[in-house]
């Protein structure tokens, strides 16, 4: 079975860089990122590896909802300027890059989904909770900074919902980190409790007469936001990749 290690480039690099007291100091960044990648390869022993980077194009999510990721701190200029050289350095270690047009998340989700559909296994190196919705047993998530797998069971326990309800949960509760609104007035606890009873977003909205008047009012008024949030949180799994698996195979 092919095992593909898929590294969320900026998720890894920005956190490594954030350990620097001065955000404009990129000295030694190449070495620190290379060391992290070597550690990942040694531990997971994949047959293939790629590091996926966000692109400069406007995300379809931003087009759909202008406030998406609003207020997020921009990448330090020195870090942005250092990325081309970093990518070259990593390619010398056989860690080749895939540059997304916009968000890396959709490319990572597409790659992982294609792999498992062809009897492969994907290990996504990222702390981005959006990948929780990829629930196939052959898609795993690895937190490099805690040196631990992020399991579906852990996410179920933390959120208080089942794996099939992750998208519905975020559509209700929102995601403050990405400025996904959810339904105003419906927080994580309420979202979890509602999904325990009604099982899905569609069932909930088809049964508002069974919900308390105060909560039903919030849900009715926030219906469009729930629909919008549902679209925003969904990962795309059919992005054109324009890449061949063989480009990312590691030498034996």
UniProtKB/Swiss-Prot annotation:
Q: Where does Mg(2+) bind?
A: 105
Question: Care to name a GO molecular-function term for this sequence?
Answer: potassium ion binding
- Give the record's GO biological process terms: DNA replication, Okazaki fragment processing
TM ranges are none
| Keyword Glycoprotein tagged | no
| Enzyme's top EC category | hydrolase
- List ligand-binding residues for K(+): 172-173, 181, 183, 186
Q: How is the cofactor bound?
A: Binds 2 Mg(2+) per subunit. Only one magnesium ion has a direct interaction with the protein, the other interactions are indirect. Binds 1 K(+) per subunit. The potassium ion strongly increases the affinity for DNA.
User: What are the EC numbers?
Assistant: 3.1.-.-
5'-3' exonuclease domain ranges (all copies)? 162-250
Listed cofactors = Mg(2+); K(+)
Listed A to Z, the keywords are:
DNA-binding, Endonuclease, Hydrolase, Magnesium, Metal-binding, Nuclease, Potassium
Residue ranges, annotated region (Interaction with DNA): 185-190
Keyword Transmembrane tagged: no
Q: What family, per the record?
A: Belongs to the Xni family.
Q: What job does this protein perform?
A: Has flap endonuclease activity. During DNA replication, flap endonucleases cleave the 5'-overhanging flap structure that is generated by displacement synthesis when DNA polymerase encounters the 5'-end of a downstream Okazaki fragment.
The family database entries (PANTHER family) matched by this protein are listed as: 5'-3' EXONUCLEASE FAMILY PROTEIN (PTHR42646:SF2), FLAP ENDONUCLEASE XNI (PTHR42646)
Specify the protein name. Answer: Flap endonuclease Xni
Tell me which species this is from: Shewanella woodyi (strain ATCC 51908 / MS32)
């Amino acid at each position: 079975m092919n095992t593909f290690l898929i590294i969320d480039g900026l998720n890894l690099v920005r956190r490594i860089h954030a350990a620097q007291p001065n955000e404009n100091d990129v000295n030694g960044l190449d070495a620190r990122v290379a060391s992290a990648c070597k550690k990942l390869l040694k531990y997971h022993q994949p047959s293939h590896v790629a590091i996926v980077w966000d692109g400069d194009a406007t995300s379809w999510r931003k087009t759909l909802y202008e406030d998406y990721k609003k207020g997020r701190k921009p990448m330090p200029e020195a870090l942005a300027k250092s990325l081309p050289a970093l990518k070259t350095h990593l390619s010398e270690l056989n860690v080749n890059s895939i540059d997304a047009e916009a968000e890396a998340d959709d490319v990572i989700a597409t790659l992982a989904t294609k792999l498992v559909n062809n009897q492969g296994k994907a290990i996504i190196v990222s702390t981005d909770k959006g990948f929780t919705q990829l629930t196939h047993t052959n898609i795993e998530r690895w937190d490099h900074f805690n040196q631990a797998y992020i399991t579906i069971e852990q996410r179920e326990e933390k959120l208080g919902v089942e794996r099939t309800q992750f998208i519905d949960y975020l559509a209700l509760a929102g995601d403050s980190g990405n400025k996904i609104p959810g339904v105003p007035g419906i927080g994580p606890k309420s979202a979890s409790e509602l999904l325990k009873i009604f099982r899905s977003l569609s069932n909930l909205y088809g049964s508002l007469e069974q919900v308390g008047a105060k909560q039903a009012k919030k849900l009715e008024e926030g219906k469009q936001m729930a629909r919008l949030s549902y679209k925003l949180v969904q990962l795309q799994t059919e992005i054109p990749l324009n890449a061949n698996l063989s480009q990312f195979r590691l030498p034996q």
